[in-house]
Amino acid sequence: MAKKVLTQIKLQIPAGKATPAPPVGPALGQHGVNIMQFCKEFNERTAKDAGLIIPVVITVYSDRSFTFITKTPPASVLLKKAAGIESGSPKPNKQKVATLKRDVIKKIAEQKMPDLTAASLEAAMRTIEGTAKSMGIVVED
């Protein structure tokens, strides 16, 4: 018989830096999950992605065991890293903060493809370009 799913918890945690402090501790503690075990496993699995924020979906079962799936970093984090900026523009339609080439957008779209609902790479690129535009990043050929 399969284990009964108690809940799913969605968090965004810096890669390799999960600690029992908030937001991880309270989110897992209220469901009786072994927080240190999660932190250790998450940090091992994400050590190679240091500096990025990694979304994680934690499935908690009725016997207090858990499994988790890590996803690709948010498009905005990847765009900021590629452009070398700290944050997007406060007024993206008037004030531009960076310029990226289309091939950089393509690499980000390829990386995000498993988590996007886009049917093709071109559609994924348009999605990433829209995120870039809303952050004040100009995309050029």
Swiss-Prot record:
Transmembrane segments: none annotated. It comes from the Bacteria. GO terms for molecular function: large ribosomal subunit rRNA binding; structural constituent of ribosome. GO terms for cellular component: cytosolic large ribosomal subunit. Pfam families: Ribosomal_L11 (PF00298), Ribosomal_L11_N (PF03946). InterPro entries: Ribosomal_uL11, Ribosomal_uL11_bac-typ, Ribosomal_uL11_C, Ribosomal_uL11_C_sf, Ribosomal_uL11_CS, Ribosomal_uL11_N, Ribosomal_uL11_N_sf. One or more lysine residues are methylated. One of its GO terms (biological process) is translation. Keywords: Methylation, Ribonucleoprotein, Ribosomal protein, RNA-binding, rRNA-binding. The keyword rRNA-binding applies. Forms part of the ribosomal stalk which helps the ribosome interact with GTP-bound translation factors. Belongs to the universal ribosomal protein uL11 family. Part of the ribosomal stalk of the 50S ribosomal subunit. Interacts with L10 and the large rRNA to form the base of the stalk. L10 forms an elongated spine to which L12 dimers bind in a sequential fashion forming a multimeric L10(L12)X complex. NCBIfam families: L11_bact. This is Large ribosomal subunit protein uL11. It comes from Caldicellulosiruptor bescii (strain ATCC BAA-1888 / DSM 6725 / KCTC 15123 / Z-1320).
